């Protein structure tokens, strides 16, 4: 017996149904952070935003540095101490610190400078009580600018340390 031909409207309906099923299977799941509602509320209160790799402080709020400097000013130290204590108060005791530079200077020098910047933030977190073993320090040099390095304001935005509470 020969197979029956499908009516064009049924064929179209079958094709659309298959397409919908295929697309539904491709949906990206939201990141699972493993954090409580209280922890998320504290992260948001402190200025963290949810990104692909976790909760990041350093997008709308930044820890900025002067040109060729790796030392924190007193206001930045106070802000960082407040953040570290707030995180620890809700049992968030693991962070990644990513230091960055603008594009002025030698690539190797900027790499080391970005590491020193991240380490200066790590020192404040350790002083606030965060275990040293739970603080990951990365220097990314000038590889990930968030602003145009052609302007003074852009270069200033790129001299920063991002604080990330990893998604687990």
UniProtKB/Swiss-Prot annotation:
The keyword Lipoprotein applies. It is found in: Cell outer membrane. SUPFAM superfamilies: OmpA-like. Both lipid anchor in the outer membrane and peptidoglycan binding are required for full activity. Once activated by certain cell stress, the dimeric YfiB transforms from a compact conformation to a stretched conformation, allowing the periplasmic domain of the membrane-anchored YfiB to penetrate the cell wall and sequester the YfiR dimer. GMP enhances the binding affinity between YfiB and YfiR. It is a lipid-anchor. A lipid is attached at residue 26 (N-palmitoyl cysteine). Disruption phenotype: Deletion of the gene does not affect attachment or colony morphology. Changing residue 59 to A: Weakens but does not abolish the interaction with YfiR. Keywords: Cell outer membrane, Lipoprotein, Membrane, Palmitate, Signal. One of its GO terms (cellular component) is bacterial-type flagellum stator complex. Belongs to the outer membrane OOP (TC 1.B.6) superfamily. This is Outer-membrane lipoprotein YfiB. It comes from Pseudomonas aeruginosa (strain ATCC 15692 / DSM 22644 / CIP 104116 / JCM 14847 / LMG 12228 / 1C / PRS 101 / PAO1).
């Amino acid at each position: 017996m020969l197979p029956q031909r499908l009516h064009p409207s049924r064929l179209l309906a079958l094709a659309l149904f298959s397409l919908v099923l295929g697309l539904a299977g491709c949906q990206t799941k939201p990141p699972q952070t493993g954090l409580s509602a209280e922890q998320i509320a504290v992260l948001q209160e402190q200025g963290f935003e949810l990104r692909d790799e976790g909760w990041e402080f350093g997008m709308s709020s930044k820890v900025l540095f002067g040109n060729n400097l790796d030392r924190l000013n007193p206001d930045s130290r106070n802000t960082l101490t407040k953040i570290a204590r707030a995180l620890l108060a809700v049992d968030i005791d693991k962070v990644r610190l990513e230091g960055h530079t603008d594009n002025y200077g030698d690539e190797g020098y900027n790499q080391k400078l970005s590491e020193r910047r991240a380490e200066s933030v790590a020192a404040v977190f350790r002083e606030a009580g965060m275990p040293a073993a739970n603080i990951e320090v990365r220097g990314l040099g000038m590889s990930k600018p968030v602003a145009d390095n052609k302007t003074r304001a852009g270069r200033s935005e790129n001299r920063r340390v991002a604080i990330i509470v990893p998604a687990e």
